[in-house]
Amino acid sequence: MTDDGYTVGDYLLDRLAELGVTEVFGVPGDYQLEFLDHVVAHPRITWVGGANELNAGYAADGYGRLRGMAALVTTFGVGELSAANAIAGSYAEHVPVVHIVGAPSKDSQAARRIVHHTLGDGDFEHFLRMSREITCAQANLVPATATREIDRVLSEVHEQKRPGYLLIATDVARFPTEPPTAPLPRHSGGTSPRALSLFTEAATQLIGEHRLTVLADFLVHRMGCVEALNKLLTADTVPHATLMWGKSLVDESSPNFLGIYAGAASEGSVREVIEDAPVLVTAGVLFTDMVSGFFSQRIDPARTIDIGVNQSVVAGQVFAPLDMAAALDALASILAERGIESPALPPAPAPQRPAAPPRDAVLTQEALWDRLAEALTPGNVVLADQGTSFYGLAGHRLASGVTFIGQPLWASIGYTLPAALGAGLADRDRRTVLLIGDGAAQLTVQELGAFGREGLTPVVVVVNNNGYTVERAIHGVTARYNDITAWRWTELPAALGVPDALTFRCATYGELDDALTVAAETQDRMVFVEVMLERMDIPPLLGELAQSASAANAK
């Protein structure tokens, strides 16, 4: 609170702090500068400025994935539209971000004045209407109902795990009000006792004495149901897999973890167990083109229990309203109470780690991802940008306690660099590892300096394969539109404000090995590694998906 007394802006900030937000991302603009005075004065919230609104939105997304809530502040029109891509990505991938937009005063709006950052027609709700397509709740705040509307939007964002939009005019932000007197209303979503009872009965009948197999995905994490999932996985010997979207959702070092299921692009052993399971539970699963081998999954609904956010389906029969956690708990109870202990799975063949290449061997995609997977340690938060980084690492098992973040549905290249900033601020006790291609990094690299400003020490790996390799794999191998300008990457950290970063340029396996060894030993500064790869050296999984994408686009 500032010397102006307690305001609507203070109320909003207190509610955000109540939801666990301690950093607010954004770019200043004249329609929210007074509100930002209250942000920087708040005892529990820190302002984190972005190089641009898109980057700030991506950073908020990365923060929200770990914290469960994030906030972004932009100015009217020009600022909010610059952030719209990031907000749309958060909507697609179920990330709770509150987008706070500073607007011209209510007097200006009522008079339909032609002020800057507008379309010049006196209509101040163009962008509010646009926001309805990419947010779950919106409000144009007015003094009489501002606090009630703030509570409504924040509750919806928290419940639905999707972005919300608050339009707050300059005079509304400074309008006097009272602090909250009760906790923010939390909606449970609701489970009908009858729906739960009927679901349990149907699931018990379908499961019988069969071994249960589980395919889990990202929505389990978004809805806060990881503990309930783990309870199910430990109720019996339960073979399980995830989609790439849900990678690191479960402990990949478990003997019951099968690997990544991606339809026809899966390893044969994983595909066989999932598709031939007597009873398969799909938990929080959303099949999209790039995580399902372009919809090549073969899941028999008659043998499937599908656990969704608010409903579940047993062999085609729908049960609702039924929360995900309640359904998972019911399945765990069925296994625990039936008195049958499934035999242990036969030991999986020990993974055949290829011998390390000679130190002077030219670096390849295979060697890069093998060595990077080996370098990751418990507690790391790995952000892999869409493309060779995401698909190169997705097939490797991660150490217990590693968190993997990607964006396979929205698939906006460049997202992970600012998102790594947000993730690092969300949990400073964990080291972030950023894996990003050269083309993607050119879109958002301005945010690199913020890591130094905020005291973060990530490992940054830029995959330099001389352009848009994913696009080359789909179409236009030699086309000019898949080329990018060559940059002197290792000079960028210093140029952008991180002069103490350690930088490496690796063209051989030995150079990569040395760089990653130093990175593991150096925790007090950024380690920036440029790796040189052939432009058409493509991870096998990505190669298969690129062929499918090319075929789909040709139809």
From Swiss-Prot:
Question: Any idea which UniProt keywords this protein has?
Answer: Decarboxylase, Lyase, Magnesium, Metal-binding, Thiamine pyrophosphate
Q: Where does Mg(2+) bind?
A: 438, 465, 467
Query: Could you name the Gene Ontology cellular component terms for this entry?
Result: cytosol
Q: How is the cofactor bound?
A: Binds 1 metal ion per subunit.
InterPro entries given in the database record: DHS-like_NAD/FAD-binding_dom (IPR029035), PDC/IPDC-like (IPR012110), THDP-binding (IPR029061), Thiamin_PyroP_enz_cen_dom (IPR012000), Thiamin_PyroP_enz_TPP-bd_dom (IPR012001), TPP_enzyme_TPP-bd (IPR011766), TPP_PDC_IPDC (IPR047214), TPP_PYR_PDC_IPDC-like (IPR047213)
The UniProt entry, under Pfam families, shows: TPP_enzyme_C (PF02775), TPP_enzyme_M (PF00205), TPP_enzyme_N (PF02776)
Enzyme Commission number(s) of this protein: 4.1.1.-
Keyword Magnesium in record: yes
One MF term in GO for this entry?
magnesium ion binding
Secretion signal span: none
Q: Where is this region: Thiamine pyrophosphate binding?
A: 388-470
Name one process (GO BP) from the record. aromatic amino acid family catabolic process to alcohol via Ehrlich pathway
Function of the protein: Decarboxylates branched-chain and aromatic alpha-keto acids to aldehydes.
Q: Which PANTHER family match?
A: PYRUVATE DECARBOXYLASE, PYRUVATE DECARBOXYLASE ISOZYME 1-RELATED
Q: This protein is called what? A: Alpha-keto-acid decarboxylase
* Annotated organism of origin: Mycolicibacterium smegmatis (strain ATCC 700084 / mc(2)155)
Instruction: Name the lineage.
Output: Bacteria, Bacillati, Actinomycetota, Actinomycetes, Mycobacteriales
